[in-house]
Regions:
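Alpha-helical segment proximal to the catalytic Tyr-Lys
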Residues: 124, 168-169, 240
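Conserved glycine-rich cofactor-binding loop
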Residues: 5, 12-13
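C-terminal substrate-recognition "lid" of short-chain dehydrogenase/reductases
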Residues: 116-117, 131, 218-249
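Residue(s) in the substrate-gating loop at a strand-loop-helix junction
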Residues: 139
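Substrate-binding pocket helix/loop in short-chain dehydrogenase/reductase
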Residues: 95-96, 100-108, 134, 212
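Short, small/polar-rich loop/turn modules that mediate ligand/substrate recognition or access, typified
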Residues: 171, 176, 242-244
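Active-site helix of classical SDR
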Residues: 119, 155, 163
């Protein structure tokens, strides 16, 4: 397959960074965006992992102008993007009685509305090209209730719904869309969660990690490269019928 132009949001760490690496290895030209991507230190670190040719630019998916401007700059620099991976995401932990409206809004704006803004920004070019692939990083939390994560669960449930609508509407134009719903993944976000769990329950980080590892049948934590491998397959010519799906990478856990 001829290399295509890909955008990966949240592409400086975790699942986004691993996905960018997989797409580059497949021959695609990749632009990664994140809120902290404008600093020279972040650009240098990302290029150490992905190579000097990758485009690294600031992107705030909570801001429509930032999304539109990012896509315009990528188009001018690399060409028309026909692959979009919405990996930008945050979480805020609080039980309903203590969940602030600000934290709720932040999660919806970044995890759900951010994916909508980026999809809307690239969609016309994908329609014109007659080909497009959009992968949205959701979560098993989008289909299961996780106590203390109301905003996160709601945003990921919405993202699964957005993915299905995008798949149905885009099918006539050669555009496929899936949601990918991992369980716990070895990322900086997960590390932060371990610290919060350990502090709340007054246990060590090692104990917090062990509890999560043993909460699924495989007894381990999913690696970001596993998610990236699925996205790589989805974006290939080997999977034309792979769309309108919520694919769980859950290490066997039914939650």
């Amino acid at each position: 397959m001829t290399g295509r132009i890909a955008i990966v949001t949240g592409g400086t760490t975790g699942i986004g960074l691993a996905t960018a690496r997989a797409l580059i290895d497949r021959g695609h030209r990749v632009a990664v965006g994140a809120r902290g991507a404008a600093t020279p230190a972040v650009v240098a670190e990302v290029r150490k992992h992905l190579g000097a040719e990758v485009v690294v630019d600031r992107l705030d998916v909570a801001d429509r102008a930032s999304c539109d401007g990012f896509v315009a700059r990528v188009t001018a620099t690399l060409g028309t993007p026909t692959i979009l991976v919405n990996a930008a995401g945050i979480y805020r932990e609080a039980f309903l009685g203590d969940h602030s409206e600000e934290d709720w809004t932040d999660q919806i704006e970044i995890n759900l509305s951010g994916a909508f803004r980026m999809t809307r920004a690239v969609y016309p070019a994908m329609v014109a090209a007659g080909w497009g692939r959009i992968a949205n990083i959701a979560s098993t939390a989008g289909t299961k209730g996780a106590p203390g994560y109301a905003g996160y669960c709601a945003s990921k449930a919405g993202l699964i719904g957005l993915s299905k609508v995008t798949a149905v509407e885009g099918a006539a134009y050669g555009i496929s869309c899936i949601a990918i719903s991992p369980t716990w993944v070895e990322t900086p976000m997960m590390t932060n969660a371990f610290h919060r769990i350990a502090a709340r329950r007054k246990i060590s980080l090692a104990e917090a990690r062990a509890e999560i590892e043993h909460s699924n049948p495989q007894g381990r934590i999913v690696q970001p490269e596993e998610v990236a491998a699925l996205i790589d397959f989805f974006c290939s010519e080997r999977a034309p019928g792979f769309t309108n799906a919520d694919v769980q990478i859950n290490a066997g856990a039914d939650w």
